[in-house]
Amino acid sequence: MFQDHPLLIQLKQQLYDKELRMVGVVKSTDKGFGFLEVNAQKSYFIPPLFMKKVMHGDKISAVLRIVNNRAIAEPETLIEPFLSRFVGKVQIKNDKLALLPKHPLIKEIIPASQPRSMKNTQLCHGDWVIAEMCHHPLDGYRYFYAKITELITTKDDNFAHWRVTLAHYNLEREAPAMPKYLTIQDNGLIREDLTELNFITIDHASTEDIDDALHVAYGTNGALVLTIAIADPTAWIIAGSQLDCIARDRAFTNYLPGFNIPMLPRMLSEDLCSLRAYEKRPALVCQVTMQHDGTLNEDMRFFAAWIESKAKLSYDEVSDWIENIGFWQPQNNAIAEQIRMLHIVCQARSSWRKQHALVFKDKPDYRFILEENGNVKNIIAEPRRIAKRMIEEAMITANICAARVLRDNLGFGLYNTHNGFDTTLIDQVVAILQKHNISVDATQLLTLEGFCALRRKLNTMSTSYLDSRIRRFQTLSELKTEPGPHFGLGLEVYATWTSPIRKYSDMMNHRLLKALIGAGKAERPKTDITFRMSERRRQNRIAERDVEDWLYASFLKNQVGSHIRYSAEIIDIYRNGMRIRLLDNGAIAFIPALLIHNIRDELICNQDIGIVQIQGKERYRQGDTIEVYIKEVHIDNRSIIAKIV
């Protein structure tokens, strides 16, 4: 009868106001208790009983109480749940349905229900699903509760981890459907007939979505005329159509080890648009003359054409032939001549870029060899051999040409830009360089010319230490709608258009280039497409890293205790240890401080200068190569622990 009395309400409010409350994020442990992390320096203990009301990652408000002279946090209000939409593994016990969320720090089994819309889907223990959290104890419910919304895959799927990872990051798991009655929509565009030319393609032997074909011929005074034909999906896909919107949303083909999800329907990406051997295909073509020293003439020309590749070649075959290894031979003299001339183009353009732009140091690609059941058979390092460099030089040439044409004729497009060093950090760069006897001017370093000069100097050094130290002061590359320099490549302007089957921004540049030759109207891209491309690239890379880390951990698990030696590069130094990359297979591992030197007081891991000291003497530095073996592997969180030999 007194519960609504104003004095009683006032008294309750006064008591409430006296209690100290903190807002933070719940961090769980495998011991049952947890912590309320308020900031990087402050956290409060959450007893096991109270942890039953919350989940790792929840943002909550908690009351602080003193129990046995210790401050503890009692969860009170849910501000933001960690789980809303989530991926879970089906658990069935005593005919009751529950889910185990896909997260290494969440061990709670969450009761769940299957909606009527899935009544015909028989779920089994171990299947994977998408679910939404419906009930949370801090919202007044007795326990957590979730509703299943979609079956991802069954427990017997050998590639379940790939599909589950894609679902976890809310990425597509299947190729788009091919629309019925889709035909080429050239709308009066005249295509030149180049089907008699000996175009060749060079790619991985297993590649089906072939974007580019190349032809080289002699011009006047011994110059070489390079003709770069790029697949033309915009011949099939009208801007603003349903298929175009799907491609725009996906932004990229998503490549995972042994598994890819295309941006376009496979009928287009791997057949009708793919520049397959002996098949007549529509293409957008760039033709440019190259002088003996690799200089490009200003005669670059873009046009639409029909082409027919005369040979599908693989990187390994072509590299072996050029290097006089093995027994493979081109099918005829015409194909052999194309390879020879393309090799000449590569050497000249590479030499020109070393002198006038920048060339990245060759680093191997790492390829996972998977068995049919998805298990890792092996992981191999593939050096960037000559055939791959030949294609790269041709594509860079094509992109330089496109960037110049779009800049000079439109003033807009989708440009790949990189601004070099962060202007706010340039003084730190200068200080580091001067400490290593490299005299530089801050203003000059912020110019394209000055940046390139420094990069060339660093490339001549015997170690990568200094290069590694200053890379963290560089800005990230960006996609922009207006032309700008790409410091990383050492170029005044750069715009990609050579992968339209697998990258939507390249499709957009196709349309702009085609508008310049009379096909359609050139419309300035909206800036939101740059944000979409950047965000989707980030999501795809996270998913790729997730799958790769899991495969690495699964593969190296069997190496624990074997003392097999690996060469490794130190890529980062932290206060608590070193991060390394195994050079044989590309795996990232960590060496904790106690495995570097067992007397902690004698060890200094200096993150600021990238050096490890033992007893006051330098022992390791960033960029060094060391010998290690695998000490521990934890599959749940994909961590690989190594120890120095």
Swiss-Prot record:
GO terms for biological process: mRNA catabolic process. GO terms for molecular function: exoribonuclease II activity; RNA binding. InterPro entries: CSD, NA-bd_OB-fold, RNase_B_OB_dom, RNase_II, RNase_II/R, RNase_II/R_CS, RNase_II/RNase_R, RNR_Ribonuclease. Its EC number is 3.1.13.1. PROSITE patterns: RIBONUCLEASE_II (PS01175). Residues 191-517 form the RNB domain. PANTHER family: EXORIBONUCLEASE 2, RIBONUCLEASE. This is Exoribonuclease 2. It comes from Baumannia cicadellinicola subsp. Homalodisca coagulata.
